[in-house]
Amino acid sequence: MGQQSSVRRLKRSVPCESNEANEANEANKTMPETPTGDSDPQPAPKKMKTSESSTILVVRYRRNVKRTSPEELLNDHARENRINPDQMEEEEFIEITTERPKK
């Protein structure tokens, strides 16, 4: 059998300069500097006062309409291209509204 070489690892009391540079780079990656040059986090913005009025959310979507013939389908596409969706009949759409309760 051949000779086995033993490797001794000594701990350094002072870290290597390249390690210090790597640690500094890692710190910069995790905490970016602010425009003023410091890395302190900014305080959270204050909450704005809510208005007294209710919020209304309107969601409009077209219902699926059954068509029996290709001619009806072609006529419907031509109609959709001519008419603005806001001008279509109300019964073709479902409207959902929500209101925020007053506090």
Swiss-Prot record:
Residues 19-28 have a biased composition (Low complexity). InterPro entries: SPAN-X_fam (IPR010007). Keywords: Cytoplasm, Nucleus. One of its GO terms (biological process) is spermatid development. GO terms for cellular component: cytoplasm; nucleus. A motif (Nuclear localization signal) lies at residues 43-51. Residues 1-103 are annotated as: Disordered. It is found in: Cytoplasm; Nucleus. Its main location: cytoplasm. Detected in testis and sperm. It holds the Pfam family SPAN-X. Residues 68-83 have a biased composition (Basic and acidic residues). Belongs to the SPAN-X family. This is Sperm protein associated with the nucleus on the X chromosome B1. It comes from Homo sapiens (Human).
